[in-house]
């Protein structure tokens, strides 16, 4: 029996017609490419000059390679309003079982919803993990959640309130170049705490600027001014004011495989009630922990971890988590491909998920051998 008193389902593999593959750039990703990507995780709007200093290469080379990574869709930088900046919101962790073969179709519908901040296909007892952010009161919660539950292909739906977010970061790639890296990095790589931005900080001109930056977070102030029909200094001043007030979140999305990392895992860590905060504070110090929040369910912490290999993930679980005082146990799911993060759709997920006749999938195509 699992912790709900329910029979533990047999773990399901991905649907037979869904093959998840790594990103194929048609070329080798170099160490310089990776350094540029890690620098963009630190600050998605950093100048090519400052990125060149970190990467140890000329500005012209870094500019050319960086623009190529953006054009290829390997890196996407977007800027969105900080969670809660337009008023009170609540976040829900959603775990879904789908009818066989419908996982991708269900996930695609979730990607289309403006309430969905995060969507990923996973292994294990569930098929999909998602985060849904809903403004307003409980009546609105019911309308949104029941509406999404009606998506064709949803077989079982589990919703849990996320009570407190301890960490959201975008700089997990630092661990490639700093084996002693901790969470004490540039605050630009972190999402500001929710509800710290007064909604009065936004007017229609501010919203227009943020709307343009959503799909191209590296757009210059000059190009924004030209498109919006205002002067450059006004755009710059408004952007800096919103950023200083904690009203903006810079989202730099990079597939872990592009950085040579293969262990992306979602954990539900069960903790003694009196130890939830101390365990969360300890986990938040690890640069490999990208997201961490407390769940209403069973005194649990919901945690996303990104590490280089399965072996390093094994060490993280057995050496780090297992020895934290108060941890009772955990369940885990491997992320296969994430389709949306920070309310922004990833540009690569459709190429990673292909509909294929299972009889036509060779071992080489699947990236393995019998």
Name each model feature, range by range.
Residues 1-370:
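A compositional/biophysical signature of low hydrophobicity enriched in polar/charged and small residues
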């Amino acid at each position: 029996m699992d912790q709900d008193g329910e029979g533990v389902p047999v773990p399901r593999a991905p649907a037979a017609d869904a093959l998840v593959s790594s990103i194929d750039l048609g070329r080798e990703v170099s160490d310089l490419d990776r350094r540029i990507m890690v620098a963009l995780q630190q600050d998605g709007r950093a100048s090519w000059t400052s990125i060149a200093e970190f990467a140890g290469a000329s500005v012209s080379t870094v500019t050319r390679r960086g623009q190529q990574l953006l054009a290829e869709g390997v890196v996407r930088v977007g800027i969105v309003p900080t969670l809660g900046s337009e008023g009170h919101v609540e976040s829900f962790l959603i775990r879904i079982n789908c009818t066989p073969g419908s996982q991708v179709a269900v996930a695609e519908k979730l990607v289309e919803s403006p309430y969905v901040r995060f969507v990923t296909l996973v292994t294990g007892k569930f098929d999909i993990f998602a985060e849904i952010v809903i403004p307003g009161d409980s009546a609105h919660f019911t309308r949104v959640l029941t509406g999404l539950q009606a998506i064709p292909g949803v077989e079982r739906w589990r919703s849990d309130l996320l009570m407190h977010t301890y960490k959201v970061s975008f700089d997990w790639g630092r661990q490639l170049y700093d084996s002693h890296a901790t969470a004490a990095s540039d605050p630009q790589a972190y999402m500001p705490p929710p509800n710290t931005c007064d909604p009065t900080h936004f007017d229609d001109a501010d919203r227009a600027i943020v709307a343009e930056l959503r799909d191209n977070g590296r757009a210059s102030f000059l190009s924004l001014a030209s498109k919006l029909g205002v002067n450059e200094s006004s755009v710059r001043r408004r952007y800096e004011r919103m950023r200083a007030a904690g009203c903006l979140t810079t989202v730099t999305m990079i597939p872990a495989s592009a950085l040579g990392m293969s262990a992306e895992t979602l954990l539900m860590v069960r903790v003694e009630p009196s130890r939830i905060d101390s365990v969360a504070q300890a986990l938040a110090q690890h640069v490999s922990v990208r997201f961490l929040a407390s769940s209403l369910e069973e005194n649990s912490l919901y945690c996303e971890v990104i590490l280089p290999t399965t072996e390093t993930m094994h060490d993280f679980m057995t050496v780090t988590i297992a020895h934290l005082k108060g941890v009772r146990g955990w369940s885990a799911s491997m992320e296969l491909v994430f389709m949306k993060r920070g309310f922004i759709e990833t540009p690569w997920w459709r190429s990673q998920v292909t509909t294929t006749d299972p009889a036509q999938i060779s071992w080489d195509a699947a990236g393995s051998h019998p």
